[in-house]
Amino acid sequence: MVMDIWTISLRILLFPSALVLCSDSFHSECYTVNGADYRGTQNQTSLDGGKPCLFWNETFQHPYNTLKYPNGEGGLGEHNYCRNPDGDVSPWCYIPEQEDGVYWKYCDIPACKMPGNLGCFRDHGNPPPLTGISETSNKQTIQTCITMCRRQRYKLAGLEAGFACFCGNNADYRKHGEMPSTDCNSVCFGDHTQPCGGDGRIILFDSLIGACGGNYSTDSAVIYSPDFPDTYGTGKACYWTIQVTDASIIRFNFTLFDIKDSRDMVELLDGYTKQVLIRFDGRNHPTHSFNISLDFVILYFFSDRINQAQGFSVVYEAFKEETIEKPNGSNNPSQTEMITQTTNLSINAARSSKILYVITTSPSRPSGHVPGWTIYALTGLLILTIIAISAKALLHISMKSARLASSSSLDSCHRGSAGEIWSIFYKPSTSISIFPKKLKGQHDDRNPLVGE
């Protein structure tokens, strides 16, 4: 199978895991529970005889239009696709006004259903679709119900009429029939942006949604931040292990990332060495999907005791090496992609030492033009040092002086202090420069898996 990705790999003996940057190859209609992220093209309220939607640039008599939101806020634009610009329980659109004064309707979009949302079903009441424990609450939210069911070790959680929660393991929950998603749009009493079923209609969820930690071994899955779709709590420290037998690459794609606090963070670690491969936080958001050349990865999330946000959803997919091929180009020739990774030095280096690698290249270059450089440990560093210094020296002094300068520079490299950071900038067909650099504002790693 040919995968539409653009790849650059860096392999270093000091850090045996290669982290690969690639273009975004995952796509799903919705990853939020209310479809606020829907950017599809359905332009009628239902695929089966629904009302046609009005264009957002022709609805100036209504609150939401392109005149008021000219920069694409909420996905609005010169189109008539269903959207959810106001954070309602599901996408909707304006319609030609009816005799009863209705001028908008929810859109029933089968493809806009976040993973873990099993759908909307009939509830005849005797017996109910889920036959475990139940409760009612005037503060009901989706995660409140899911948490109760998960604590009681039920696999399914269902909500009905905005305030009722049901738990169970019933495999035949579909027996009374599946209904349109709009039948389950009664707002949750505890959060009016979330759908909590309807009258005689129950919306079902997998109870793993929003769990703080878990173990995954399937080829693909979606992992949500703790307490999702509610905001994540304070003081969280969660681990998810992802170990896929025979996988050579695991691809990660953050389909949602809303972490505003710079002290809250998401890390991906080598499952074998516990070394941090990449870190994201409130200031450093993931902008692309990326591959990790391992079959065992740990996802770690930490939140401090102040501030909260929506959190994240991440899709992972495991591949065998023969299924990955490079394309000839990219959809965005002008875009320069960059990834930064910080790694620990060798076991004998000082604990405060770090190496910062910054690799840049253009995805528009044909794959045949992308250098296949592989840098091995200190040998690679020595070669790059000699090339860079020799090239500069040739402009001014003889070859003998250049070799002396290279030897002197190599000695000074080995005498660098333990707390010093080296940055390597590499661009195809351009010069290579190596220089020491202090990493400002780097907080100590709060991940207990990383040794002191």
Curated annotation (Swiss-Prot):
From the UniProt annotation, give the residues forming the signal peptide. Answer: 1-22
* Disulphide bond pairs: 30-112, 53-93, 82-107, 120-184, 145-165, 149-167, 188-196, 212-238
Residues on the membrane's Cytoplasmic side span: 391-452
Q: Which terms does the UniProt entry file under GO BP?
A: signal transduction; Wnt signaling pathway
For the keyword Signal, the answer is: yes
Q: Which residues form the Kringle domain?
A: 29-112
Q: Where located?
A: Cell membrane
Q: Topological domains (Extracellular): residue ranges?
A: 23-369
Task: Identify the GO cellular component terms for this protein.
Answer: plasma membrane
User: Chief subcellular site?
Assistant: membrane
| Keywords from the UniProt entry | Cell membrane, Disulfide bond, Glycoprotein, Kringle, Membrane, Signal, Transmembrane, Transmembrane helix, Wnt signaling pathway
User: Which stretches are transmembrane?
Assistant: 370-390
Pfam families attached to this UniProt entry: CUB, Kringle, WSC
Specify the WSC domain's residue ranges: 114-208
Give glycosylation sites per the record: 43, 57, 215, 253, 291, 328, 344
Q: Which Gene3D superfamilies match?
A: Plasminogen Kringle 4, Spermadhesin, CUB domain
One example GO MF annotation:
transmembrane signaling receptor activity
PANTHER family under this entry?
A: KREMEN PROTEIN, KREMEN PROTEIN 1
Describe its function. Receptor for Dickkopf proteins. Cooperates with DKK1/2 proteins to inhibit Wnt/beta-catenin signaling by promoting the endocytosis of Wnt receptors LRP5 and LRP6. In the absence of DKK1, potentiates Wnt-beta-catenin signaling by maintaining LRP5 or LRP6 at the cell membrane.
Subunit notes for this chain?
A: Interacts with lrp6.
Name used for this protein in its record = Kremen protein 1
Q: Which organism does this sequence originate in? A: Xenopus laevis
